[in-house]
Design a protein with these regions (language model features):
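Claisen-condensing/thiolase-fold acyl-transfer catalytic domains that form or cleave C-C bonds
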Residues: 50, 54-57, 80-81, 99, ...
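Short beta-strand segments
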Residues: 7, 77, 107, 132-138, ...
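Conserved beta-ketoacyl condensing-enzyme motif
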Residues: 3, 45-108, 229-250, 256
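A contiguous, well-structured pocket-lining segment that forms one wall/lid of small-molecule binding clefts
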Residues: 199-268
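Acidic-glycine-rich active-site phosphate/pyrophosphate-binding loop
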Residues: 24-33, 83-97, 130-140, 193-196, ...
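Buried hydrophobic positions in well-ordered alpha/beta secondary-structure cores of metabolic enzymes
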Residues: 3, 31, 60, 71-74, ...
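Condensing-enzyme catalytic core mediating Claisen C-C bond formation in acyl metabolism
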Residues: 1-45, 148-213, 217, 221, ...
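Flexible, glycine-rich active-site loops centered on histidine and acidic residues
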Residues: 123-158
Length: 316
């Protein structure tokens, strides 16, 4: 399975930490030292997870050699949907008039991208598809509560899209060596560590310490697992693209793995926690740099709990 191309979309509205002083009493210094976040992007009133997904696909088509007509599978991922019936994947299918293909949306919180890719892998293995469009989008600010001093300041919005094929389509395609996912609902605070109950309240981080501990442990564990399983060592890894939940989590994982800051892709300072989109944006923004290496890994942890990793190699 190969990653052919990737692109992302960020809303134009930028929210600095100063905004939250009036909302939840937290200063810029307090937020930055504890999260690593300085600014984040916020969707405009006429934007949502679906519209941002469409914009990400538009950007993808601008830079890709693949026509949308080649797609025979669309997988969408989000935990902040605009519509739970007319889902992200269906809206993308409609907007770009992609006929007679399967369109599926998935949610495993911040792990949704890796699960979406694993679903693609399954369709390819069953010979039910050859070319997939994977789209992830998060409208976190539509669900977050700015006055929440525990989590209101964490979230940012954005979307990303990628073409994935069963066979290599170009010399610069990146090959998926393996994808691993894991449900962790029975670990720690599992299903209640982070919550979003639309009929009741917005995004809540009820057990932040529990999330922190398990995110550090499982992102480290699954990264080691995917490398070892495929005969690689940490020293072989050129770049790590971790979920952008908190700079302390990112630094902890990198330290446990023994990976330098130079090899760790970070965008949380500018974008906040963009949920399941964060690693896709990290790859999209740093694609030229990543392609100069040989081996890189996406590693994630999500509410629920869940974790996942994808190991890829370039064509060097």
């Amino acid at each position: 399975m190969f990653l052919n191309s990737i692109a992302h979309y960020l809303p134009s509205i930028e929210i600095s930490n100063d905004y939250f002083l009036e909302k939840n009493g937290l200063t810029d210094e307090w937020i930055y030292t504890r999260t690593g976040i300085k600014t984040r992007r916020k969707a405009s009133p006429d934007e949502n997870a679906n519209t941002m997904a469409v914009e990400a696909v538009k950007h993808l088509l601008e830079i890709s050699k693949s026509p949308i007509e080649d797609v025979d599978l669309i997988i969408g991922g989000t935990y902040t949907p605009f519509d739970t019936v007319g889902t992200l994947a269906h809206v993308v299918q409609e907007h770009f008039n992609v006929s007679d293909v399967m369109a599926i949306s998935v949610s495993t919180a911040c792990s949704s991208l890796i699960n979406a890719l694993e679903i693609v892998e399954g369709y390819f293995a069953m010979n039910k598809a050859k070319k997939a469009l994977v789209v992830v989008s998060e409208h976190n600010t539509g669900y977050s509560v700015d006055s929440d001093e525990f989590a209101g300041h964490l979230w940012g919005d954005g979307a990303a899209a990628m073409f994935v094929s069963k066979e290599r389509t170009a010399d610069d395609d990146m090959e998926f060596i393996e994808i691993i996912t894991q449900g962790l609902a029975n670990v720690g605070k599992g299903t209640i560590g982070v919550g979003l109950q639309p009929l009741k309240e917005g995004i809540k981080m009820r057990y932040g310490k529990d999330v922190f501990v398990h995110a550090c442990n499982y992102m480290t564990k699954i990264t080691n697992e995917i490398l070892t399983k495929n005969g690689f060592k940490i020293a072989d890894l050129d770049y790590l693209i971790p979920h952008q939940a908190n700079i302390r989590i990112i630094n902890n994982v990198a330290e446990q793995l023994g990976i330098s800051q130079e090899k760790t892709i970070v965008n949380i300072e500018r974008l906040g926690n963009t949920g399941c989109v964060s690693t896709a944006i990290g790859l999209s923004e740093n694609l030229d740099k990543v392609k100069k290496g040989k081996l890189f890994c996406l590693t994630v942890f999500g509410g629920g709990y869940s974790s996942g990793a994808a190991l890829l190699k370039t064509n060097h």
